[in-house]
Regions:
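Extended, well-ordered alpha-helical scaffold/bundle regions in very large, multi-domain proteins
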Residues: 174-209
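Conserved, well-folded catalytic cores of nucleic-acid-processing
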Residues: 36, 56-64, 101, 162, ...
Length: 218
């Protein structure tokens, strides 16, 4: 323990609702976890399967995560930084980190709100082809950099589901019904805020350089 003289503790559970806690001895600081896998869960001993799970759920955790001596996460992703600290290249590199096989995006918006709700994130507007099919799992929802879901249709307006990227908010209710989400005041505010930010960005591009704006839709 970080507290000098504190006693080490051993926690043990066989998978049932009950567990045991007992004093033990330990020289080094920190926690060691030994997980026993039964035959039915043998897939979780496969390196590719483990890396896939870690990449999905631990990709942007705010503390370094190592797997077999290799750090597998980015604890300081672009959306946690101020827009003034990022360059165009930074935004494009983060897009590649999220979608390594996609073409560069048309533009992006950086969300950074702390009142009346907390919301950070980066949303990208992808290149759209005539045969483009909207995929509704391209926006990832996080809560303090912990992955929650990629089902955000009740948080992001339906007509903006072509957007891609990340939103992070501790003010969005977790593990609740769709009807509850639709009635939550913070979700409504976040929904409206995202809509306005996209509209403002489109208006900005149109006003500053109409030929370039029109070229984006060719």
């Amino acid at each position: 323990s970080y507290k000098e003289g504190a006693e080490a503790v051993r926690w043990e559970c066989d998978g049932s609702p009950e567990y045991s806690l007992e004093p033990t001895s330990k020289e080094s600081r920190g926690t060691e976890i030994v997980l026993h896998i039964n035959e039915e869960s043998a897939e979780f001993l496969d390196t590719v399967r483990v890396e896939s799970i870690l990449n999905k759920f631990c990709r942007f955790l705010p503390v370094p995560i190592k797997y077999e001596d290799k750090q597998i996460n980015n604890p300081t992703p672009a959306w946690t930084k101020k827009p003034s600290e990022l360059t165009t290249e930074d935004y494009q590199n983060f897009y590649k980190e999220l979608y390594p096989y996609n073409e560069p995006p048309l533009f992006w918006i950086h969300l950074n709100v702390d009142y009346p709700f907390n919301l950070t994130g980066i949303l990208y507007f992808p290149k759209i082809k005539q045969s483009y099919e909207i995929q509704k799992d391209k926006i990832q929802l996080y809560c303090n950099q912990v992955f929650v879901t990629d089902e955000v249709k009740d948080i992001v307006p339906e007509f903006l589901m072509l957007l891609q990227g990340v939103i992070d908010s501790p003010d969005i209710p977790l593990n609740v019904s769709r009807s509850y989400l639709q009635g939550d005041p913070n979700v409504k505010k976040i929904n409206n805020h995202i809509t306005k930010k996209v509209a403002d960005k489109l208006d900005e591009i149109f006003t500053k350089d109409r030929p370039e704006f029109e070229k984006k839709w060719d």
